[in-house]
Amino acid sequence: MKIHEYQAKELLRKYGVVTPRGFHTVSVDGAVKAAEELGGKIWVVKAQIHAGGRGKGGGVKLARSLDEVRQHASDILGMQLVTHQTGPEGQKVRNLLIEEGADIQKEYYVAALTDRATQKVAIMASSEGGMDIEEVAHSTPEKILKEFVDPLVGLTDAQAENLARGIGVPEASVAKAVDALKRLYTCYMETDASLAEINPLILEGNGNIKALDAKFNFDSNALYRHPEIVDFRDFDEEDADEIEASKFDLAYISLDGNIGCLVNGAGLAMATMDTIKLFGAEPANFLDVGGGATTEKVTEAFKIMLKNPKVKGILVNIFGGIMKCDTIATGVVAAAKEVNLSVPLVVRMKGTNEDLGKKILAESGLPIIAADTMAEAATKIVAAVK
C-alpha cells in the first residue's frame, strides 16, 4: 500500500524526523490559507499523487507571493499529472501539500528496504539526492552506499556514521544525519514498511537536516496490525478494478496488453504471462484466483478482465492441486454465459479432476478452445486475437 507525501511526513514527524512545516489541502482557498498560516516569503505548492517525478511533470511549483500560491494551486489541482511512473494517461491531482520554503545547501538520498539476498534491512544513502535513484544506480552506482542491518541488533551508530560521512555530510551535521537515519530505520521497522525513502534529505544553511520529500510503501499482509496506516489509504489513487478484485480476494494487477489471464497461483500466473510474451503478445493483467476459487470468484474475475476494452481474448491456465479442475470449469462456463463472452477463450487445465473439468467445458456448448500445454495454450490465444 502506498501513501501520499504529506502522510509520509506525518509518520516521519511522529518518529522525530524533522520535516518542513506544511499543510494538506484539497482546495485553492485552502492553499492560500495554508500559506498565510505558514508565513514567510516563499512557499512550495506540491501535487499529491502516488507517483514520483512530480516536479518534472509540473506538479511542484515555487511561489513567492500569495497570488502565486493561488495561481499554482489553481493550475495543479485537478490537472492530469503525467510522470515517468504514471504512464501516458497520468493521474488526476486531488490533493495538495503547501510547505514553507527551505534553505537548501545540499541534497542527499536515504532509504530503508528489505534485502532478500542477505535477509537483512538495507539502508541506502547517496550524495546524489533529488534525482531518480534508478538513474544514479545506472550511471554512477559507486555513489550509492549501503549498510546491511541485522533486525535483531538494529542500525548502529557506527553504521549510520559510515553512511553520513560516506555521502559527504559536513562533520558539524553528522550527528543530526545519524539521528535522522536511525529514526528512519525505527519508523521503517515499526510500521512494517517495505520501503521508507527520503529523497531528498537536505542540509540547510544552519546545519539542520530535514526530510524534504518522503515515500513509503507498506506490506499489505501486515496492515491488520496498523489500522492507523490503513486510514491513510486513498482509494482515488488506486486502480478501480484492483479495488473491486480485492473485495473477492482476487489478486489482480492491470497491465497494457490485450490477452486477459486467469490463473491459480502467483508463480504459474507469472509463467503464463512470460509464455504469452514469448509467443509475441502481451498480457492484459495478472490475475491469481488463489486456491479457494468459487464460481462467484471466477465470474467476477471474468467481469473485471472484460471491463478492460483492450482485452481481445482470455487465457485460463489452471493447475488442479487444492483447486479442483471441475470447480474451475463450472465457474468458467457460468461466467462465460453470464457475461455473454464474445472474445476468444482458451482453457488449459491439469491436475485434480482434470478429465471431469474438460468434460464440463466440452459439453457446455460454448466455443471454448482447449489446450494441453502452456505453449499450446499461448499459441492458440495469440493466434485467436490476431
From Swiss-Prot:
The keyword Chaperone does not apply. ATP binds at K46, G53, R54, G55, E99, A102, E107. Pathway: Carbohydrate metabolism; tricarboxylic acid cycle; succinate from succinyl-CoA (ligase route): step 1/1. Its EC number is 6.2.1.5. SUPFAM superfamilies: Glutathione synthetase ATP-binding domain-like, Succinyl-CoA synthetase domains. Gene3D superfamilies: ATP-grasp fold, A domain (3.30.1490.20), ATP-grasp fold, B domain (3.30.470.20), Succinyl-CoA synthetase domains (3.40.50.261). One of its GO terms (biological process) is tricarboxylic acid cycle. Its cofactor is Mg(2+). Binds 1 Mg(2+) ion per subunit. Keywords: ATP-binding, Ligase, Magnesium, Metal-binding, Nucleotide-binding, Tricarboxylic acid cycle. Substrate binds at N264, G321, I322, M323. Pfam families: ATP-grasp_2 (PF08442), Ligase_CoA (PF00549). It catalyses: succinate + ATP + CoA = succinyl-CoA + ADP + phosphate; GTP + succinate + CoA = succinyl-CoA + GDP + phosphate. Residues 9-244 form the ATP-grasp domain. Mg(2+) binds at N199, D213. GO terms for cellular component: cytosol; succinate-CoA ligase complex. One of its GO terms (molecular function) is ATP binding. Heterotetramer of two alpha and two beta subunits. Belongs to the succinate/malate CoA ligase beta subunit family. Succinyl-CoA synthetase functions in the citric acid cycle (TCA), coupling the hydrolysis of succinyl-CoA to the synthesis of either ATP or GTP and thus represents the only step of substrate-level phosphorylation in the TCA. The beta subunit provides nucleotide specificity of the enzyme and binds the substrate succinate, while the binding sites for coenzyme A and phosphate are found in the alpha subunit. PANTHER family: SUCCINATE--COA LIGASE [GDP-FORMING] SUBUNIT BETA, MITOCHONDRIAL, SUCCINYL-COA SYNTHETASE BETA CHAIN. This is Succinate--CoA ligase [ADP-forming] subunit beta. The lineage of its organism: Bacteria, Pseudomonadati, Pseudomonadota, Betaproteobacteria, Rhodocyclales.
